[in-house]
From Swiss-Prot:
The lineage of its organism: Eukaryota, Metazoa, Chordata, Craniata, Vertebrata. SMART domains: ANK (SM00248). This is B-cell lymphoma 3 protein. One of its GO terms (cellular component) is nucleoplasm. InterPro entries: Ankyrin_rpt, Ankyrin_rpt-contain_sf, NF-kappa-B_inhibitor. The modification Phosphoserine is found at residues 41, 374, 402, 406. ANK repeats lie at residues 134-163, 171-200, 204-235, 241-270, 275-304, 308-337, 338-367. It comes from Homo sapiens.
Length: 454
C-alpha cells in the first residue's frame, strides 16, 4: 500500500489571502490537487537496479499502473489537467476505468455504491458539488488553477443539478471570491453571468467589489460591474470594518479602481461606520497627494467632518503635511472650522510653515523686483502706512487731510522744510486731561508753563 506524501496528513485549511507564499514554485504551499497548472516537465529516467526498471508509484492513483482513459469525456477539453499536472483520470469513473477517482480516493468497487454507474450525469453532479476536507468543491479548485474549460463544465453541472454557485469553503470563500483574488476577469465574468451573487460576503464581510479593490484589480472590478445585473450590486455596502469599496480603493491607492467606482456612481462622501471619515480624510491620513487631488477633482466635500468634528484640514495641519494643507486651502477648506474640542486647524498645527499657510502669509507670491514710486501709488496709500507717516510728521496733521491725499510739495527753488521729528516736541497744553499723567512711580509732574510766560 503506498504511503502518504510527507506533510499531507498535517496540512490544514489553506488561507489563500494571508498564508505566506512558499519560496519555491508558485503554489507549492497548496495541496497537490489545488496547485495552479503549469507545463509538465520531462521526467528523468528511473535508475536501473538489480531487478530491472523501477516504476515510481503515484500516491493519488493508489498504486495502479493502468494508463488513463484517452479521449475527453462530455466535451471536457483536457480533463487530465484538471487537478494537477500530468496524466490523470476523467472527471467521473467509467466501466473502462480501473483506478480510483482522483478527488475522493475511493477504489472503483466503492464508487458505484455512492453514484450508480447507469446515471453518469448524476455522478458528475454529485462529484462536482462534493467538498473536500477544506470545504473546497471541484469548482473552487478549477477557479484557483485558472482552468477555464473545467470551470465551464462544472458551472453547467451546477446549473443542471439546480445547485447554487455560491458555495462557501472553510474560509468562507465562494468561487467568485477566489476568481477575484486570483485576478481572473474572464472567470469572474463567467461566474457572475451564470448566477453567482456579487454581494456574497466572506469572513471579513467583504463583497467581491471589496476584494477587487483590496487586490488592486481594476480589470476584475470592471468585469464585475459589467456582468452584474442591474440592482444586484450595491457599491455602498460596508464590510465589518465599516468601509465601502471606495474606502478600500482609496486606502490601497489604486487610482484606476477609484476612477471606475466614481464613474459607476459610488458616493464620494460616504463615511465609514466606525469614525465617520470620508474617502478624502482617508486619503489625507494616508498622505496621498495624488489621491486627494483626484477626489477633489470629482467634487469631494473639502469641509466634510468626521464624528469628532475634525475635517481633512485638521488632519493635514496636525500631521504637518505641507503639500496637502496647501492643496486643501486652495480648494476652499475652512481654516476656522472647529471640532468637538473647539479646536481650529490653526490651533492643532505644529509647523510654522503650516501656520503661515493657514494665516494666508505663505500663499502670497513674493515680488522679485520693486517698482519705481509713482504719484498713483502715493495716492493709494493704505491707512496703516498713512498713520505711520503721520506719526513721524511726514504728513500734514490737519484734520482736513485724508490718507488718500499726498502731502503738499514745496515750490521749485525752495528747500523742503525739515520734518517734525527733528524739532523738539512741544509741551502738551494745560487743558488736556493727560497733561499731569504720572511718568514714574514718583510724584506727578505739573504741566510746563506756556512759552513766553513768567
Amino acid at each position: 500500500m503506498p504511503r502518504c506524501p510527507a506533510g499531507a496528513m498535517d496540512e490544514g485549511p489553506v488561507d489563500l489571502r494571508t498564508r505566506p507564499k512558499a519560496a519555491g514554485l508558485p503554489g507549492a504551499a497548496l495541496p497537490l490537487r489545488k496547485r495552479p497548472l503549469r507545463a509538465p516537465s520531462p521526467e528523468p529516467a528511473a535508475p536501473r537496479g538489480a531487478a530491472g526498471l523501477v516504476v515510481p508509484l503515484d500516491p493519488l492513483r493508489g498504486g495502479c499502473d493502468l494508463p488513463a482513459v484517452p479521449g475527453p469525456p462530455h466535451g471536457l477539453a483536457r480533463p487530465e489537467a484538471l487537478y494537477y499536472p500530468g496524466a490523470l483520470l476523467p472527471l467521473y469513473p467509467t466501466r473502462a476505468m480501473g483506478s480510483p477517482f482522483p478527488l475522493v480516493n475511493l477504489p472503483t468497487p466503492l464508487y458505484p455504491m455512492m453514484c450508480p454507474m447507469e446515471h453518469p450525469l448524476s455522478a458528475d453532479i454529485a462529484m462536482a458539488t462534493r467538498a473536500d476536507e477544506d470545504g473546497d468543491t471541484p469548482l473552487h479548485i478549477a477557479v484557483v488553477q485558472g482552468n477555464l474549460p473545467a470551470v465551464h463544465r462544472l458551472v453547467n453541472l451546477f446549473q443542471q443539478g439546480g445547485r447554487e454557485l455560491d458555495i462557501y469553503n472553510n474560509l468562507r470563500q465562494t468561487p467568485l471570491h477566489l476568481a477575484v483574488i486570483t485576478t481572473l476577469p474572464s472567470v469572474v465574468r463567467l461566474l457572475v453571468t451564470a448566477g453567482a451573487s456579487p454581494m456574497a460576503l466572506d469572513r471579513h464581510g467583504q463583497t467581491a467589489a471589496h476584494l477587487a479593490c483590496e487586490h488592486r484589480s481594476p480589470t476584475c472590478l470592471r468585469a464585475l460591474l459589467d456582468s452584474a445585473a442591474p440592482g444586484t450590486l450595491d457599491l455602498e455596502a460596508r464590510n465589518y470594518d465599516g468601509l465601502t469599496a471606495l474606502h478600500v480603493a482609496v486606502n490601497t491607492e489604486c487610482q484606476e479602481t477609484v476612477q471606475l467606482l466614481l464613474e459607476r456612481g459610488a458616493d464620494i462622501d460616504a463615511v465609514d461606520i466606525k469614525s465617520g471619515r470620508s474617502p478624502l480624510i482617508h486619503a489625507v491620513e494616508n498622505n496621498s497627494l495624488s489621491m486627494v487631488q483626484l477626489l477633489l477633482q470629482h467634487g469631494a466635500n473639502v469641509n466634510a467632518q468626521m464624528y469628532s468634528g475634525s475635517s481633512a484640514l485638521h488632519s493635514a495641519s496636525g500631521r504637518g503635511l505641507l503639500p496637502l494643507v496647501r492643496t486643501l486651502v486652495r480648494s476652499g477648506a475652512d481654516s476656522s472650522l472647529k471640532n468637538c474640542h473647539n479646536d481650529t486647524p490653526l490651533m492643532v498645527a505644529r509647523s510654522r510653515r503650516v501656520i503661515d499657510i493657514l494665516r494666508g502669509k505663505a500663499t502670497r507670491p513674493a515680488s522679485t523686483s520693486q517698482p519705481d514710486p509713482s504719484p498713483d501709488r502715493s495716492a493709494n496709500t493704505s491707512p496703516e502706512s498713512s498713520s505711520r507717516l503721520s506719526s513721524n510728521g511726514l504728513l500734514s496733521a490737519s484734520p482736513s487731510s485724508s490718507p488718500s491725499q499726498s502731502p503738499p510739495r514745496d515750490p521749485p527753488g525752495f528747500p523742503m522744510a525739515p520734518p517734525n521729528f527733528f524739532l523738539p516736541s512741544p509741551s502738551p497744553p494745560a487743558f488736556l486731561p493727560f497733561a499731569g499723567v504720572l511718568r514714574g512711580p514718583g510724584r506727578p509732574v505739573p504741566p510746563s508753563p506756556a512759552p513766553g510766560g513768567s
